[in-house]
Amino acid sequence: MNSKIQKMELNDGHSIPVLGFGTYATEENLRKKSMESTKIAIDVGFRHIDCSHLYQNEEEIGQAIVSKIEDGTVKREDIFYTSKLWSTSHRPELVRPSLENSLRKLNLDYVDLYLIHFPVSLKPGDELLPQDEHGNLILDTVDLCDTWEAMEKCKDAGLAKSIGVSNFNRRQLEKILNKPGLKHRPVCNQVECHLYLNQSKLLAYCKMNDIVLVAYGALGTQRYKYCINEDTPVLLDDPILCTMAKKYKRTPALIALRYQLERGIVTLVKSFNEERIRENLQVFDFQLASDDMEILDNLDRNLRYFPANMFKAHPNFPFSDEY
């Protein structure tokens, strides 16, 4: 099946499909599900798959991709696969081994995009969130410019076609962009972005610097108890959004996704439900009028569903700045 998903050019000459399939699964029993849903996503036309070492399901996602290559649904070059460097591997000597470890699990020769997942560095080791005896995270101090140099080497070695960052604020992006001897610019910054956190200032800054903004959490959140405040409003229940959905005869989710695409944002969407996975591709079947875009712009309330407060003590915590 030919994918109707449009692509956006990156600053290094590669291009990224503007709609991506997210694979984050919180619990072990969902990892199997993430494999099945990734197969479905590829079958219905998704070509951009977003994963990470942190999600602990790269093996399953790799199996899904390889099985779809083996059955002739896609070729490797049809798939745009993103992986991410976790915070316990920021030290330069750990960057390439971490990527190679992901590639082994995936059974792939390269990733299309490799991101620094979060700007906060943690103590190296097997524990994803290393803690001391009091339950506090054990932080590490690494210059992100040194990490970036190691990322550049991964690109030069052909292990990653493109490299970028995630959850960086403007100041942190500037630090990389102004690094002496910078060889490769970040192609993107993947951040939480939705109607209640529309990231308009960060988006403007990224566009000015030819960096693509990639949105996660574009539909709000699946309300994981461990990481969000349950008192936060449910984005897809927003009355203005629901009224607009009726006007366009679409679901609130499709309006929320279309809003991002109209702004030139690459958007990730995650579902384990086959019907919804198919439905999400309908985002290319309509457009929003400019006055409706303005109405949606005004829903912004600077609300983070993923505040990542456990990292607040680190000097590189990204969300204390305005953007």
Curated annotation (Swiss-Prot):
According to UniProt, the reaction catalysed is: (17R,20S)-17,20-dihydroxypregn-4-en-3-one + NADP(+) = 17alpha-hydroxyprogesterone + NADPH + H(+); (17R,20S)-17,20-dihydroxypregn-4-en-3-one + NAD(+) = 17alpha-hydroxyprogesterone + NADH + H(+)
- Which residues are noted in the entry as NADP(+)-binding? 20-24, 50, 166-167, 190, 216-221, 270-280
Keyword Nucleotidyltransferase, does the record have it?
no
By its UniProt entry, which Gene3D superfamilies does this protein fall under? Answer: NADP-dependent oxidoreductase domain (3.20.20.100)
User: In its keyword annotation, does this UniProt entry include Transmembrane?
Assistant: no
Site (Important for substrate specificity) residue list: L54
Tissues of expression = Corpus luteum (large luteal cells).
Residues bound to substrate: H117
The family classification in the record reads:
Belongs to the aldo/keto reductase family.
Per UniProt, subcellular location reads as:
Cytoplasm
Active site as annotated: Y55 (proton donor)
Q: Name one GO cellular component term.
A: nucleus
After translation, the protein is modified as follows: The N-terminus is blocked.
Lineage, top-rank taxon, reads Eukaryota
A biological process term (GO) from this entry = cellular response to prostaglandin stimulus
Gene name on record? Akr1c18
Its protein name is: Aldo-keto reductase family 1 member C18
Q: Which Enzyme Commission number(s) are on file for it? A: 1.1.-.-, 1.1.1.149
Q: Which PANTHER family match?
A: ALDO/KETO REDUCTASE (PTHR11732)
- UniProt main location, coarse: cytoplasm
Q: Which InterPro entries match?
A: AKR (IPR020471), AKR1C (IPR044482), Aldo/ket_reductase_CS (IPR018170), NADP_OxRdtase_dom (IPR023210), NADP_OxRdtase_dom_sf (IPR036812)
**Per the record, a Pfam family?**
Aldo_ket_red
